Every structure is written in structure tokens, then in C-alpha cells.
């Protein structure tokens, strides 16, 4: 038996990647700032918002990872819905805060039984090894969840809780962390700074690098679609 790598022969791997490409539904950004990128680099958000062509487009492998995340989120939502522990549960809830030029999609929005407060659940998938290093929510994930909660608070006038939920791609192990109020303040500050650049028509600064640091191995530069555009 031969292992197929492609070349002149059709492969399922090629068909799968093409299917992902043809069925992927991009969420067009209606605003300059989105929750999914707010905790990252403001300069990259500027490039995305102004339609700058990516100098480092995503590879097919990353789209497979994104799709896997969607599958895990869908399974988790269905099982949570079937648990009977929630008065309400909604999947993929859009949010918009026009005054802050902000929008996004909440993974899951719930009200636990007997609770009056809404809670934002921000889901992140990772392999089981990653759980070894988890000490709390990653800053970019905490800011994302907090920004959605802030948006709901602005809409409803009521306090909204937030939680970052990590799910193992290997065995559905779950680690979950409530998001402290300080992250709400940080998310709001990022929005205010980003909007200040927007008002002034300026491109946000590059993130600083330590001397000798390899930009291709530094988050968030390593996975940035505009790395060459920004760093040259």
C-alpha cells in the first residue's frame, strides 16, 4: 500500500482543503474593531479594517484548525443545551457597539437556572498538552470575552459575567476561568486607544521587540497575515 501525497493524483486531503475554502463563511467586519482580534495587535486590526491585502495569507492548515474549533464549539453547545442547567442558551450571538466601532460574535450566551445575570462563554480549543501550562485565561482571550460582556452591558443596562472556556481537542477536557472586572477595564482602554488612532487617521504603532528577538516566533507577530507588510 502506498501513502498518497498528491502530485498528479487526486487526494481527499486536496478535496477537503478545497471544500473548506469554498464553504468558509468569512464574517465581514462591519466595524474597525472586533472581539476576536481586540486583544492582539492594533496595527493588524487597522490593516484588516482598511482592506489591506495580507502579505502572509493563512495556509490551508490553519483553516483546518479553525474548522476543528467550529466543530468542537457546535458539539459543546448541543450538550450544554441538553443539560437542562440553563434558563436560556444562545449560540453565535452577534453584538454591535456603534459608538466604539466594535462588533463580534459571542460563542455562547447563557443564563444559568435561578440566575438573573447573563454570562458570556468564550470557547477556545487546544490539545491536551496545552492544559499543563494553563494558569488562567490568556490575556487576549480574557479581553475578547470581556469586550463581548461590555457590549451586552451597554445594550441591556445590566451586569454581564464572562468566562473563558478551554476545551481539549483530544478528549473534551474542560478548563474554565471567570473573567475579572479588571479585564473589562483593559478591553475598554484598548477600544479607546484604537478609536483615538482612528479619529486621528494614524496607523497604530508596531509592537516593540527585544533586541535579537525572532519576530517569526513572537506572538502575535508569528501568525500575523500582515507580517511582511509591517516588519518588511
Residue ranges and their predicted role:
Residues 68-72, 144, 183-186:
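Short amphipathic alpha-helical segments
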Residues 127-129, 170:
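Feature marks short, surface-exposed loop/turn motifs that line or immediately flank catalytic pockets
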Residues 101-104, 140-143, 147, 186-189, ...:
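Residues forming well-ordered secondary-structure scaffolds
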Residues 4-6, 135, 151-232:
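Metal-dependent nuclease catalytic regions and adjoining charged, substrate-binding loops involved
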Residues 41, 148, 224:
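A residue-level signal for conserved active-site and pocket-lining positions in enzyme catalytic cores
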Residues 74-82, 112, 136-166:
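Metal-dependent nuclease catalytic cores in nucleic-acid-processing enzymes
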Residues 90, 119-122, 161-166:
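A structural signal for short, well-ordered beta-strand segments and their strand-loop junctions
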Residues 1-120, 129-133:
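Metal-dependent nuclease catalytic cores that hydrolyze phosphodiester bonds in DNA/RNA
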Amino acid at each position: 500500500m502506498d501513502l498518497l501525497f498528491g502530485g498528479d493524483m487526486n487526494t481527499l486531503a486536496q478535496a477537503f482543503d478545497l471544500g473548506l475554502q469554498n464553504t468558509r463563511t468569512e464574517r465581514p467586519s462591519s466595524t474597525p474593531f472586533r472581539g476576536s482580534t481586540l486583544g492582539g495587535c492594533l496595527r493588524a486590526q487597522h490593516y484588516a479594517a482598511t482592506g489591506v491585502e495580507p502579505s502572509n495569507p493563512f495556509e490551508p492548515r490553519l483553516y483546518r484548525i479553525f474548522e476543528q474549533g467550529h466543530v468542537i464549539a457546535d458539539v459543546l453547545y448541543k450538550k450544554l443545551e441538553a443539560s437542562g442547567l440553563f434558563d436560556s442558551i444562545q449560540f453565535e450571538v452577534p453584538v454591535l457597539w456603534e459608538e466604539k466601532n466594535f462588533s463580534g460574535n459571542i460563542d455562547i450566551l447563557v443564563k444559568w437556572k435561578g440566575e438573573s445575570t447573563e454570562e458570556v462563554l468564550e470557547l477556545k480549543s487546544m490539545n491536551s498538552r496545552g492544559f499543563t501550562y494553563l494558569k488562567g485565561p490568556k490575556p487576549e482571550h480574557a479581553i475578547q470575552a470581556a469586550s463581548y460582556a461590555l457590549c451586552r452591558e451597554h445594550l441591556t443596562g445590566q451586569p454581564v459575567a464572562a468566562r473563558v472556556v478551554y476545551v481539549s481537542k483530544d478528549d473534551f477536557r474542560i478548563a474554565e476561568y471567570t473573567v475579572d472586572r479588571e479585564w473589562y477595564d483593559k478591553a475598554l482602554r484598548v477600544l479607546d486607544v484604537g478609536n483615538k488612532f482612528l479619529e486621528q487617521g494614524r496607523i497604530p504603532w508596531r509592537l516593540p521587540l527585544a533586541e535579537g528577538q525572532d519576530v517569526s516566533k513572537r506572538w502575535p507577530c508569528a501568525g500575523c497575515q500582515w507580517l511582511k507588510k509591517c516588519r518588511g
